């Protein structure tokens, strides 16, 4: 029997809470002079990358679950193919590659969805603001993972942009640790944003 896709969304929310709790413990160690600022910022970067990997895998799980009829959404979704084997499904979705990319969302997930799901729903129904949030998350991921001139320029242009960010917070990991609002780091805000986006995707 198919289960509600909202169970996947609950898993993403739980992972985000775990990352936020982890960051709070790191801050306590830093305040107690048991962790250097450099190590603290590196830990923020690692925590974000870990969550991003889990998030992208959750998009894959949602996609395959809907295609194979294992998951249901309240949004009208209908698989265009009948596949019982997950191995076969993964091969078809990957299109001959060893694995399938899901982000950038527009480039991979939205482009792939109409071949497997009627109208590409729910992925083609993701609104513009949510797609922007997913793209921004990917820019941050690339800047942290690659630290190349190109990825850092993309980060500066598309993530920092015109907003005021103190000079010492203009690198990716330091940016994540910086304050989005009183009592909330940028990483905490960004994870909450992705949780919201994925929850809407699953409805």
Q: In which residue ranges do the predicted regions lie?
A:
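Helix-loop junctions and short alpha-helical segments
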Residues: 40-140, 153
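Charge-enriched, short contiguous segments at helix-coil
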Residues: 31-34, 38, 113-195, 202-203
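Short, helix-capping/interhelical loops that line the mouth of catalytic, cofactor-
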Residues: 1, 82-90, 162-174
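Charged alpha-helical initiation segments
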Residues: 1-53
